A protein has these predicted regions:
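N-terminal catalytic or cofactor-binding beta/alpha core of small enzyme domains
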Residues: 1-31, 36-122
Length: 122
């Protein structure tokens, strides 16, 4: 189940309600939280995966409830002065390409195709 889309996003104003709904409807499920993030300039375009909760809003100095058991982030901008307008300048095409990559990667991990054990990268 996907919660949060372009048409119906999860954001600071509805985050707590979304977390409550997910925990109530899927109490024994692992929650994978996915978000765009800021990081070191040389890491822009990288995807991170880790164990533990995602802390949304940290890049813009917001204190929001942590979410998830596993997190995936796409680094879309360099960290700086906690300026919320900085993320407004990120090209949507960058975010969409990273979202497509993350989606394809999760799908391949959960529903592997037969004989899809390796992929040529060079």
């Amino acid at each position: 189940q996907v919660v949060g889309t372009l048409d119906c996003p999860v954001h600071a104003m509805n985050l707590e309600q979304a977390i409550f709904m997910v925990r109530r409807c899927y109490p024994d499920h692992v929650i994978v939280a996915v978000d765009a993030s800021v990081g070191r300039s040389e890491h822009v375009g990288c995807v991170t995966l880790g164990k533990g909760a995602l802390r949304p809003g940290l890049g813009v100095c917001k204190e929001l409830q942590a979410v998830g058991d596993i997190f995936i982030t796409g680094i879309v901008g360099g960290c700086g002065s906690c300026d919320p307008l900085m993320l407004q300048s990120v090209r949507l095409s960058v975010v969409m390409r990273m979202a497509d990559y993350i989606c394809d990667s999760v799908r391949q991990a959960l529903v592997p195709e037969p004989h899809n054990f390796c992929r040529r990268v060079l």
